């Protein structure tokens, strides 16, 4: 009996991303009547290695950390080239702080920073590279124009019978199935209105959760975006009815704060709510909040939220994240509600409802301005205890874990400033937007110092989006540099291969991904 066996083996070896060798092996043919023979055939491809790297010369503005490239162009021995990821040796915080010190590196200083191209086995750490740094007396350059911007959803149409249209319609059907009364329950409870016939809220918007209202904000955004995308007339009509009901009932709640003070000769405002001595004694328990919500007449003109203003006021006393006793991200929830109203004002084609949604958002935005302008400040120097001597230091407020999480307040208030027409209101809303700057976070970033490490990613990414939106609204280049530096640091030091940048909602240490 003749038995023949052909085996083909192929070995492919990689170093980093570079293909080294492919070896197909035709092993042998066996015949019991013949002497066994074997033939080994090899086909070796020349090893590819990095032969050169594009020179790295950085002209670094004095008082800043060099903006080192997170990718560099390399050329291989086969003549091909590509961008490869880098890792630099100056990532220690103390090193960066020294590089940003104009006394250590004055104008005209020259020095080098070593690094590696990762994924290469030239050395244990990778292919060695060096950046030459020269400190110069110039400012960072500004991108002269927008490279890209979003297209308004109501200018986009998806046609035909396909997965996109199917998913759109499924999403809209889900949104119109939600009970609008459930989204209004907490507001009515907060403003002393009857909740009879209204479905009680649940989950993270339940009456026992201080994050309540954030889900209703998402709901309003969902209604607005679904309305802009809907093509089915019956779906569009249901969405219109739900939007109209939300807007009308929220305005009813808000108008209960329009309380005239004969003593002051004006309406009660945010600055009048909880004078300092009262604020210092304010409690954050649920028993206290049961009492707080009976005092809606003191909330201040324009306040609109699913929880009384005691919640955002408590952060002025630096109260910690604690759903039972203190706070849970007060301004995070306010942002979601502002964003939802702004989305309705943007996408609703019923002008009366769109205008009313904008009016609600504007009045709430001006409540925020009033509170920030008159009752808060920024003090950066001293110890934490010294910075917290008096209520309302935003340096401390926005640097607190979760309690100081403000979502996209900066972005929404800047966006709102672009939608109102009165110059004074525009100016106040931009000021309010910038009140949500975090000096402890922004100022190191403005110098390209990586103070991202170990921060709460969910809390700080929206701040950067707010900074970029502020730049578009006020043309202050400080905000551009903060945003631009953040992006480069994230791409080079924190981005995982999946595209994520955090672990457990937290940034970790640079290059530990």
Task: Tell me what each language-model feature is.
Residues 43-81:
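Solvent-exposed, low-complexity, repeat-rich "mucin-like" stalks and linkers
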Residues 2-12:
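Bacterial N-terminal signal peptides that target proteins for export
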Residues 12-22:
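Bacterial N-terminal signal peptides
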Residues 140-513:
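Glycan-recognition and catalytic cores of secretory/periplasmic carbohydrate-active enzymes
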